[in-house]
Amino acid sequence: MPKEPASASLPTVKVSPRGSNRLKDGHVWVYRSDIVTADSVPPGSLVTVTDHRGKPLGTALYSSSSQIAIRMISSEPITDLPALLRHRIAGAIAYRAPLVMDTDAYRVVFSEADFLPGLIVDRYAEILSVQILTQAMDADSVRQVVLTELTTTLDPASIVERVDPRVRELETLPPRASGLLQGEKSATTFTMNSVQFRFDALEGQKTGAFLDQRENYAASARYAKGDALDVFCYQGGFALHLAPHCTQVTGVDSSRPALEVADQNAALNHTLLNGKEIEWIEANAFDLLKDYSSSAHPHEARRYDTIVLDPPAFAKSKRDLDAALRGYKELNLRALKMLRPGGILVTCSCSYHVSQSNFLEMLASAALDAHRPLRLLEVRGQAKDHPILLSVPETSYLKCVIATVSR
């Protein structure tokens, strides 16, 4: 972790041996169960962290409500939080400069992975989308520093805050609506891999679009062929990348508003798609795959040359793991049954609690049950603008497997 200059005293939080060992191993979180003392520490404070004997371990942001009570920001003592924030934001922007030269949409700040816990910033052309996830980052003084630095460095037309009410409730923060923080523009068009997308900062999931899949969109396009099915297509990310390489593409999602945006995105890319029409189907993915893969009437079962599965996170916690793996297996089993010999499967999981080994074991089991031998072409993760901090495994969450059925 970057070192900062030493400075004056801060409130002190003492952690247990287990908590201090976790920090010494390079992680940046300490859970509430490992707090020994945090007497009279105001919510969202900058604090000095010590081990149970009182030895300083560094400086952190403190949450009085979250199960993650401590988020480390330096292994050295600091008090000038504004200077630290400006330095870290500038560092995050510089880190990405050589990685995003071919796109105007990317993640600018990725929380712990950029040593800025509780802050996420995405860029969509001239609009920045910000998420504040902790008590410390929600302080008015911190907000102002963040906005000023982003404005000075990136000169956006607008900055929009996307609010997750569940997170604010967990952090016992007052309710707040998503909205413009500065500027007036909330909608634009951005480009990924030469494909254009409509973006409205006050609509959609997460901070607006799935930027973490940008490199996987391009990779899937290299293998795409024939008739393609994009399941959980949302606003058409995979479908639009597949279409120039396929004879026919169908996108499936349960959200009518998302499909309406997907259709608008297809219209934006009319020339790139050579006038091809993408079929958009509003349906429950599990029900549709069950219907399409039915063996009751083999002559009626649908067959495809390329299938993409990009479902939402099935495992929000460890206790969801078994159910999540069952869900993933059902989806992949049905998709494998629908692929023609030599067909391409692109299958994803954005659940951190489903490890890469969990996911590959599930996929091997599905292939065995479907009697469709699978050969791996690529095992991929999130785009490089979503960096992975090796000492914080939670920063690695996206799995994307590209495979081909042998027969």
What label would you give each PLM region?
Residues 178, 182-407:
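Rossmann-like S-adenosyl-L-methionine
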